[in-house]
Design a protein with these regions (language model features):
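Short hydrophobic/aromatic-rich beta-strand segments that constitute the beta-sheet cores
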Residues: 34, 51, 85-87
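Short, conserved beta-strand element in jelly-roll/cupin
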Residues: 36-51
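Short histidine-centered beta-strand/loop micro-motifs
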Residues: 16-17, 32-36, 53, 59-60, ...
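Short, surface-exposed charged micro-motifs
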Residues: 41, 66, 76
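Conserved short histidine dyad/triad with adjacent acidic residue
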Residues: 8-10, 18-37, 70-71
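Ligand-binding loop in jelly-roll beta-barrel domains
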Residues: 71-89
Length: 89
């Protein structure tokens, strides 16, 4: 499993990463499989999801979390509340 979550990073850190200039992705409540072929960093603006990596424990992510998904990660997304996030590959 390679999911790192930083809860409530400070604004200076987000600005230094350029988070607010990254594209935005939105998705309604749903469940679907996903594979990360390369590392992705995202900042959750709103919503909540449970992500279950193949062979690992589930993690909950939500508004205010900075999340890094490792390359070659296979997982199942269960979006509990419609999600909106900035992301960078």
């Amino acid at each position: 499993m390679n999911i790192d979550i930083e809860h409530q990073p400070d604004k200076a850190q987000l600005e230094s990463l350029g988070v607010f200039n990254w594209p935005i992705w939105e998705k309604e409540a749903s469940t679907f499989p996903w594979t990360y072929y390369e590392e992705e960093i995202c900042y959750i603006l709103q919503g909540k999801a449970v992500v279950t990596p193949e062979g690992g424990p589930s993690v909950e992510i939500g508004a205010g979390d900075l999340v890094t998904f490792g390359a070659d990660l296979r997982c199942m997304w269960h979006i509990v509340e419609p999600i909106r996030k900035h992301y960078r590959l």
